[in-house]
Amino acid sequence: WRHMRFIFLIIFLISNIYANTNKDFTLYKKDGTTSGHTLLIIGGIHGDEPGGYFAPAFLEKYYTIKKGSVWIAPSVNIDSMIANQRGIYGDMNRKFSTISKDDKDLKNIEKIKSLILDKKVDLILNLHDGHGFYRQNYENAIFNPRAWGQATIIDQDKIHSLEKFGNLDEIASTVRDNLNKDKLFQDHHYFGVKNTETKAKDEQQQLSLTFFAVTNNKPAFAIETSKNITDLTEKVIYQLKSIEEFMRIMDIEFSRNFDINNYKEVQKLLF
C-alpha cells in the first residue's frame, strides 16, 4: 500500500507538471455583520508581479470586514506565479474578449468572468505591478505617460448607464489625492490616474479584465504599484492603502490589527 501511495504521488506530481489547465484558484469571501456593497479583488493575474498577489493575500489574512463584503481571489494565475513569469500560457489579462476552447487558462478566465458578472459585485479591482512611474508629461524613460507604475488605471471617464460608482475618473482621482496626501516612502512615489481610453485608443486593453467588466456595466479599476520600487513591503503598503481608499468610497467598514504606516510591523507580518 505504501508503494501504491508513492506511485499515486508521482502520478499526481507528473500530471500537475503536464497539466492541460492552469490550477484552480480560491475565492475568499469576507462579509461584515452589516450588509452593504461588495468589492471584488483579483490578484496574481500576472505571475511576475508580487505586489499584485502579496497584497490581497495579506488583506485576506489580516483584515476584518465589519460592513459590506470583500471577495478576494489573491492568486488567479498560480502556474505563472510559481514560475515567476508574466503568463506561461500567454498573457491572461488579454483573454477576456475571446479565448480558444483548448486554452489552459480557459477555466480560470470563465470563473473570473462569472465573479465579475455576479449580481452582488459592485466594483472590481485588478492588482498589478507596472513598469516605471506614470506621469502625464514625458520626463525620461522611467517617468512618462507610457509607464504604468504608481497609477490607478481606468478604461474611460464614466460608465454612463450606471449611477452607482459609474464615475470612474472621479473615484480614481479621489483615491489618488488621498494616497498622495498620506505618507509616501519617497517623494517620487506619488500616484496618478491613467485613462487608457480603451474603446477609442487601445486595442490591447480591449482584451483585458477591466474592459470586460466595464462593457458589462461593472465599475473596474487596476491598481499598479511600480516595478521600479524593489522593496516588496513598500509595494504591499501602497496596494493596501489604495484598496482601503476604494473601501471607504464604497462605505465598506473594516479594521486591521496592525499599523499600516509602521513599515517594520507590516514587513514582519509579510515575511
What are these regions (language model features)?
Residues 20-271:
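Structured catalytic-domain cores with a bias toward divalent-metal coordination
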Residues 1-3:
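Short, Lys/Arg-enriched N-terminal segments with co-localized hydrophobic residues
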Residues 6-15:
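Sec-dependent N-terminal signal peptides
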